[in-house]
């Protein structure tokens, strides 16, 4: 992974985009090792930390969410060894919760989404999260028909023969069971059975197994079911997939708790620690009780799962791309360890951010050898958080030679939590943060926030385009997959061209890419085709690929510019709104005047808030940016943006504002429905507003809409307009 880690809140658009690309590839690799080969390289806590980092970046930069995002995936593509089975209902994973605050946020989000429900009126179930292998067992006419692993959430592996060897799983259901029912749960190996198996393996002179989870997964994937039968696998049932009678959807209970009780009646093992509560405090207390009992359980668990109990509320809450809104997994804390800070090195990020990294005496944390830990910024070294609060006692600054507590949780690189002062060497010098960039030697400064007057927590290099650490990353972003995506011009090639000072080869800014062919043709000395790694055919392909990108989609061009806060989705919004690059650039220059119509129009675009708008305007106010763009546009023919078709929609292309207390749907539901019909939902009323939907308590927005002559309607009229 990249070493120049900085806190999510301090990432720039380019830094976030690059790290999301890394995380997508890294998580996919670990998924393949964990789900496909049962040979993980990292602990569950480390994997969760990677996912948390990915999710945190996506939450901070929603416009950068990738098509191959780990947040859209579940599990791993099924292996070809087993026949595939398509799940009748997807087997989604759960979002993770790591703290009391996260838990309370989850409960609050449920109430917020449902709306108009009194406190403590929603019941939640809480049960141990079994560290095993998720399974869906399908019964037809009450007989076990098939069994499939989760796989990628849509398609799993057919392990029916192996599942039949697990004695705890019924081969037939009672007469009151529906015609079709999918029972979902976790296959696991008990700790006692695992120890006995390893003892036998050792006695036989064979290699022992690493842990119960991997052993259970490997045992279930045996091609010979007789091997599986000898492994003493077990099962806990906890959820339903498809349920139907006579081809029509059916229910066996109205609550999650009732489903588990029905499983018990049918003969399935269910977890005895599952309970039902109505407050976040009760859930937290049960979480702590399970944590205390954890060492004495005969099975591995890595957290507690909370679910909204009523199935009708689950249906209203629905799903995100890969997880339900009505459930979360509260994970247990990661492990900590003690080690020594051997050195503190400075890494320079893509926009000049100077990030200190502690080089540590190697130590094993959670089954992984740790040698580095992020120190975030100068304040963190001193024990001060990003909001200015003290996170460690005043004399607990981090120094070279200190013995420190390291934890792997919540970040890709481990964090140094605290210092053991009693082990600090006499005369240990305080760490002095550098005042110059270690890459280019330019001054490094902490900018002052114009609104708050506070110093930024991040120290940045002022070198700009003269600093290699920044300029080369701008180029890599420009040619990245969601930007210009030029075949044959990847990160390795960009490094080569950027490092060259030969006028016939050098690429320092984006326009240089499109003049490379002409410079090569004019050169009598340096020919790219004669350089190692290139050839006549590959050079021709590269030039053809560059020429093919001269006619570029408008949203790709806008995204490629690397404007802070402008990701792929935001770029598409801007492209659809302005149509052509000429119109876009002209509008951005005009929007520098906050009293202008251009400023109002920019802010009215759904998804473009004031922070994004100001970042775009500041970008177009910088003369050096305009110089690069002018040279770039002379080499391109940007395409006009295509406008989406929403044929038949009465609100397609209209700008809609919702205000007041909505009673028939939540604000999120209203926005989602309007956008699905092609409407643009804005947060404020302007001359561009077409419809104002006003609920009880509508105030200034209704008054302004009336003043501007905007069409207004109540919820019933809105529902009648869009067809309910």
Swiss-Prot record:
Enzyme class: ligase
Gene Ontology MF annotations: DNA binding; DNA ligase (NAD+) activity; metal ion binding
Superkingdom of the source species: Bacteria
Gene Ontology cellular-component terms listed: cytosol
Stored PROSITE patterns: BRCT (PS50172), DNA_LIGASE_N1 (PS01055), DNA_LIGASE_N2 (PS01056)
Residues annotated for Zn(2+) binding in this entry: 437, 440, 461, 467
Record InterPro entries: BRCT_dom, BRCT_dom_sf, DisA/LigA_HHH, DNA_ligase, DNA_ligase_AS, DNA_ligase_CS, DNAligase_adenylation, DNAligase_N
Keyword Ribosomal protein: no
Alphabetical UniProt keywords: DNA damage, DNA repair, DNA replication, Ligase, Magnesium, Manganese, Metal-binding, NAD, Zinc
Cofactor: Mg(2+); Mn(2+)
Biological process according to GO: DNA repair; DNA replication
EC numbers: 6.5.1.2
Domain BRCT: 646-724
Name this polypeptide is given: DNA ligase
Organism: Agrobacterium fabrum (strain C58 / ATCC 33970) (Agrobacterium tumefaciens (strain C58))
């Amino acid at each position: 992974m990249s070493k120049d880690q900085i806190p999510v809140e301090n990432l720039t658009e380019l830094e976030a985009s690059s790290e999301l690309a890394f995380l997508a590839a890294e998580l996919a690799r670990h998924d393949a090792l964990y789900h496909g080969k049962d040979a993980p390289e990292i602990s569950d806590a480390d994997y969760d930390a990677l996912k948390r980092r990915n999710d945190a970046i996506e939450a901070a930069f929603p416009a950068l969410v990738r098509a191959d995002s780990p947040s859209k995936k579940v599990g791993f593509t099924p292996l070809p060894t087993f026949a595939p089975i398509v799940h009748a209902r997807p087997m989604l994973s759960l979002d993770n919760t790591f703290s009391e605050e996260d838990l309370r946020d989850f409960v609050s989000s449920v109430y917020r989404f449902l709306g108009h429900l009194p406190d403590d009126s929603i019941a939640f179930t809480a049960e141990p999260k079994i560290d095993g292998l998720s399974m869906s067992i399908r019964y037809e006419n009450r007989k076990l028909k098939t069994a499939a692993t989760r796989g990628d959430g849509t398609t799993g592996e057919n392990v029916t023969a192996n599942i039949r060897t697990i004695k705890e799983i019924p081969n037939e259901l009672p007469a009151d069971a529906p015609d079709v029912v999918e029972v979902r749960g976790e296959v696991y190996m008990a700790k006692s059975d695992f120890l006995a198996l390893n003892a036998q393996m050792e006695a036989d002179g064979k290699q022992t197994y690493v842990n119960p989870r991997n052993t259970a997964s490997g045992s279930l994937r045996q091609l010979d079911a007789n091997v599986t039968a000898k492994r003493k696998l077990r099962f806990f049932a906890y959820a339903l997939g498809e349920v139907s009678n006579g081809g029509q959807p059916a229910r066996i209970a109205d609550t999650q708790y009732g489903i588990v009780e029905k499983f018990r009646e049918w003969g399935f093992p269910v977890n005895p620690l599952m309970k039902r509560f109505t407050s976040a405090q009760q859930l937290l207390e049960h979480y702590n009780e399970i944590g205390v009992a954890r060492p004495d359980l005969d099975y591995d668990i890595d957290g507690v799962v909370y679910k909204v109990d009523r199935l009708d509320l689950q249906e209203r809450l629905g799903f995100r791309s890969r997880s339900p809104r009505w459930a979360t997994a509260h994970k247990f804390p990661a492990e900590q360890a003690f080690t020594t800070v051997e050195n503190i090195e400075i890494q320079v990020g893509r926009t000049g951010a100077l990030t200190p990294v502690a080089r540590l005496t190697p130590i094993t944390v959670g089954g992984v050898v740790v040698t580095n830990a992020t120190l975030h910024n100068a304040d963190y070294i001193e024990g001060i958080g990003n909001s200015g609060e003290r996170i460690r006692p005043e004399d607990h600054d981090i120094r070279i030679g200190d013995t420190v507590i390291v934890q792997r949780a919540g970040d890709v690189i481990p964090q140094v939590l605290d210092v053991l002062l009693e082990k600090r060497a006499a005369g240990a010098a305080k760490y002095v943060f550098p005042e110059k960039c270690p890459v280019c030697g330019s001054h490094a400064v902490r900018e002052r926030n114009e609104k708050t007057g506070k110093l930024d927590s991040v120290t940045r290099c002022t070198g700009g385009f003269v600093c290699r650490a920044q300029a080369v990353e701008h180029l890599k972003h420009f040619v990245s997959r969601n930007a210009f995506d030029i075949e044959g011009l990847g990160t390795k090639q960009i490094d080569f061209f950027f490092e060259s000072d030969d006028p016939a080869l050098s690429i320092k800014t984006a326009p240089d890419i499109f003049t490379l062919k002409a410079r090569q043709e004019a050169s009598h000395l340096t020919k790219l085709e004669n350089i190692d790694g290139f050839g006549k055919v590959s050079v021709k392909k590269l030039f053809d690929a560059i020429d093919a990108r001269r006619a570029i989609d408008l949203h790709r061009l806008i995204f490629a510019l690397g404007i802070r806060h402008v990701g792929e989705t935001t770029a598409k919004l801007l492209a659809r709104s302005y149509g052509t690059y000429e119109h876009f650039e002209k509008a951005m220059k005009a929007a520098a005047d906050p009293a202008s119509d251009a400023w109002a129009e920019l802010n009215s675009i759904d998804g473009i808030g004031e922070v994004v708008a100001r970042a775009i305007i500041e970008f177009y106010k910088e003369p050096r940016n305009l110089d690069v763009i002018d040279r770039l546009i002379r080499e391109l023919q940007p395409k006009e943006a295509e406008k989406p078709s929403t044929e038949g929609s009465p609100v397609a292309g209209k700008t809609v504002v919702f205000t007041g207390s909505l009673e028939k749907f939540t604000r999120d539901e209203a926005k989602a429905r309007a956008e699905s019909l092609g409407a643009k939902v804005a947060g404020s009323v302007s001359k561009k507003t077409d419809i104002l939907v006003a609920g009880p308590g509508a105030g200034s927005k209704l008054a302004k809409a009336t003043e501007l002559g905007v069409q207004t309607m109540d919820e019933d009229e809105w529902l009648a307009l869009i067809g309910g």
